[in-house]
């Protein structure tokens, strides 16, 4: 109550202001403006006592509120300033509420906002904030007016008004919570309409206001709000994400019905644990610890045994990561069955950022669930199959980390029972990517311990070496994941891998056979070296020596079905080439396999591939097939069973290519072997001189050349007389290389004319030969003239001393 002196002072001031009050009704806005400024000077700007100001405020309030509707913006502005000054200074501002609140509601809370000036709307909202601050609970009777105002101003076009409105929402909720919950829900619609505003600070304010509304409401609208808050976790502004984290954390700590919403709120807070901003991560960690501790205290009776006998962290617990508290872990475990379906749905969302956030959340959930993951393993594997095939690198990386956690927390026997059938037949799982189960297997193996995997190594090795797995696809991604699985087993189990050395080698050979990229083949070869190191072997040769018999038997089991499309032919090549000298130790097993594959009735393209491999081996025979010096024992078999049957002429381009390849092998044999089948061989080579292929004719000439060198003076007269006419034909060949090689072969042919060659009876042959050779002395190609003809003639003279033939031939017209 004002004292008598304060009342007199107020009355005196009011008398002095009577003229100014009358001027407020003037038509001239300047006069009204001056009157308001005079009121301001004589009241709120004077150092009057609180009681006197209270009396003045009561006397001037209606006039000032009327000025809020003044046509002049400057007058309305001054009136608001005077009102604000009185509210801040008077001891009982609540006395003004019966008139002030309806006036504000009329100005701001109607269907149409009457105040056109955005700065004045902001000033009015600041006045309302001040009223909430100084009046508090005494505003309860005016809640409806405030709700009307806020419903309109939250969606105001002016961002500053939006922010001030959100501030008022929080103040109302905290000032009169007992009444606010009755009307709180009516504010959610305008708030959610504004939560995606372009200004980040507006989004922050709306998020905070939404948190207050839900906190002090009946809690029925949490579901309506969650999706909007979840979207704000992807906000580009760290301040917005921080606000969401604080709001959700506060709900988990204080929301009256929070237990009903744990499964919906926990994912939002845990998502912030993976935020890119350290401050937000730290904030989320602190809130999560508080939530876990509070829940632990609230449920002490249920957790008594676990609290009294706390189990240590799993042995393979992620290094550098603090283990969550018991309360946090239990909260996740008890809600995991409700969380995983949503995770499985969102991991396939069309938005990349949603998939990344979900993948990060999955890892955090598994870190909390620990061995409780086991009961959800099937659904977890399904989620991981999809996620590990995601085109986004971040999604795949997070899911691989999740798979490693499964390896650390789940028994190997359990996850292998579910996972290996999917590896053998990827169509049995829901993934469209054949490499997805392999990807998950590789990551889980990486997360497992050596002791856990050791009893199951044979099962793992057999699965990886199964034809449907190691030969299941030529896709680069599939082969990469096969290598990842092999490397994971080698890395974790090390020397224990000796029991599945053969299976792993089969996988690595298969990868090299299917790989279309040299980089993949190099990786596979590196894995072979790692396999050797794991067993203490000196190199790949030792590894192949250990398993060559089994590898050849592995290939022999299916060789009758090989075609040009069979991977086995390439596997054979890799084994033979990479084993080096070891292949020479297993000729009894290798050559029958080659014989079967090179039968003329088999696929021509497949035979061509085998001949190409054989040619490479023969060219380096001392370090491959003949490394033990025993290849000569099998030479006749090689010629009779492998080469000669394939030199027989057959129609078709494929058959011609096979004959060319066989000639290439024959030439390699002739370069380093002694033969006992020269008669048969020379017949086949003579036939090959007529091939359509230039390369085949060239190889045939070279082979005859080598054969003549190897069988010097051992060929009978008939064989020699059959050879030279065919060589003479090749001197007229369209290919210069073939002509040159034919002349070289003829030169060697002369050296084969030993004592058994009857020059008298064969005189017509010699005369014909010399006559034909002399024709080439005038060949337009000087290389042909100069190359071998003089040498041939001289050899005839020196070796056989039949000068009369030379002289007669030279003088024959």
Where are these regions (language model features)?
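Extended, low-complexity, acidic/polar intrinsically disordered regions
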Residues: 1-813
């Amino acid at each position: 109550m004002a004292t008598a002196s304060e009342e007199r002072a107020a009355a005196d001031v009011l008398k002095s202001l009577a003229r100014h009050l009358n001027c407020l009704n003037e038509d001239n806005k300047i006069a009204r403006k001056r009157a308001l400024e005079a009121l301001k000077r004589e009241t709120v700007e004077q150092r009057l006592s609180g009681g006197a100001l209270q009396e003045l405020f009561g006397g001037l309030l209606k006039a000032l509120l009327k000025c809020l509707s003044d046509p002049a913006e400057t007058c309305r502005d001054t009136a608001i300033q005077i009102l604000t000054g009185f509210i801040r200074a008077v001891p009982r501002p609540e006395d003004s509420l019966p008139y002030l609140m309806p006036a504000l509601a009329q100005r701001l809370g109607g269907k149409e906002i009457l105040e056109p000036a955005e700065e004045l709307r902001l000033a009015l909202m600041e006045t309302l904030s001040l009223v909430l601050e100084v009046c508090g609970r005494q505003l309860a009777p005016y809640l409806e007016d405030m709700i009307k105002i806020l419903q309109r101003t939250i969606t105001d076009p002016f961002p500053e008004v939006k922010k001030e409105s959100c501030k008022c929402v929080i103040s109302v909720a905290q000032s009169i919570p007992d009444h606010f919950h009755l009307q709180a829900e009516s504010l959610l619609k305008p708030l959610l309409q504004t939560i995606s505003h372009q200004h980040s600070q507006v989004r922050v304010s709306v998020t905070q206001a939404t948190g207050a509304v839900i906190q002090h409401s009946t809690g029925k609208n949490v579901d309506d709000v969650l999706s909007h808050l979840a979207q704000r976790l992807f906000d580009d502004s760290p301040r917005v994400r921080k606000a969401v984290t604080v709001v959700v954390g506060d709900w988990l700590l204080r929301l009256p019905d929070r237990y009903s919403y744990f499964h919906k709120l926990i994912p939002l807070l845990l998502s912030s644990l993976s935020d890119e901003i350290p401050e937000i991560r730290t904030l989320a960690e602190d809130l999560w610890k508080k939530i876990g501790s509070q829940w632990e205290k609230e449920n002490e009776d249920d957790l008594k045994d676990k609290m009294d006998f706390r189990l240590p962290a799993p042995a393979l617990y992620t290094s550098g990561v603090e283990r969550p508290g018991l309360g946090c872990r239990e909260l996740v475990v008890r809600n995991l069955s409700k969380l995983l379906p949503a995770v499985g749905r969102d991991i396939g969302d069309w938005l990349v950022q949603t998939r990344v956030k979900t993948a990060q959340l999955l890892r955090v959930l598994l870190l909390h669930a620990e061995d409780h993951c086991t009961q959800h393993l099937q659904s977890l594997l399904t989620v991981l199959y999809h996620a590990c095939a995601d085109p986004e690198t971040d999604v795949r990386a997070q899911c691989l980390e999740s798979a490693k956690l499964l390896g650390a927390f789940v028994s190997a026997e359990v996850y292998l029972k579910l996972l290996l059938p999917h590896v053998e037949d990827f169509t049995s799982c829901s993934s469209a990517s054949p490499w997805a189960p392999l990807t998950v297997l590789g990551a889980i193996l990486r997360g497992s311990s050596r002791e856990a995997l050791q009893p199951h190594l044979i099962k793992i090795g057999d699965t990886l070496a199964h034809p449907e797995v190691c030969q299941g696809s030529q896709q680069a991604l599939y082969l990469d994941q096969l290598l990842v699985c092999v490397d994971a087993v080698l890395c974790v189990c090390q020397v224990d891998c000796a029991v599945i050395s053969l299976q792993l080698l089969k996988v690595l050979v298969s990868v090299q056979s299917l790989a279309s990229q040299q980089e993949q083949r190099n990786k596979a070869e590196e894995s072979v070296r790692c396999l050797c190191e794991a067993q203490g072997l000196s190199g790949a040769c030792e590894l192949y020596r250990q398993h060559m018999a089994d590898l050849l038997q592995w290939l022999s089991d299916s060789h009758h079905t090989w075609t040009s499309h069979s991977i086995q032919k390439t596997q054979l090549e890799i084994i033979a080439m990479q084993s080096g000298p070891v292949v020479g130790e297993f000729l009894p097993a290798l050559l029958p396999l080659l014989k079967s594959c090179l039968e003329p009735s088999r696929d021509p393209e497949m035979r061509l591939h085998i001949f190409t491999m054989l040619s490479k081996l023969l060219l380096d025979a001392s370090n491959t097939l003949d490394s033990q010096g025993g290849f000569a024992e099998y030479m006749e078999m090689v010629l009779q069973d492998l080469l000669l049957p394939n030199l027989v002429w057959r129609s078709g381009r494929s058959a011609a290519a096979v004959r060319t390849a066989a000639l290439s092998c024959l030439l390699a044999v002739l370069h380093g072997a002694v033969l006992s089948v020269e008669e048969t061989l020379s017949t086949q080579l003579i036939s090959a001189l007529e091939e359509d292929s230039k390369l085949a004719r060239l190889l045939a000439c070279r082979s005859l050349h080598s054969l003549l060198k190897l069988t010097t003076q051992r060929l009978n007269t008939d064989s020699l007389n059959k050879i030279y006419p065919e060589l003479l034909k090749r001197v007229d060949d369209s290919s210069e290389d073939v002509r040159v090689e034919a002349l070289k072969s003829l030169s060697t042919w002369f050296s084969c004319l030993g004592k058994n060659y009857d020059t008298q009876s064969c005189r017509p042959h010699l005369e014909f030969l010399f006559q034909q050779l002399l024709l080439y002395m005038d060949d337009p190609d000087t290389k042909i003239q100069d190359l071998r003809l003089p040498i041939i003639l001289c050899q005839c003279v020196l070796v056989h001393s039949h000068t009369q033939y030379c002289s007669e031939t030279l003088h024959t017209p």
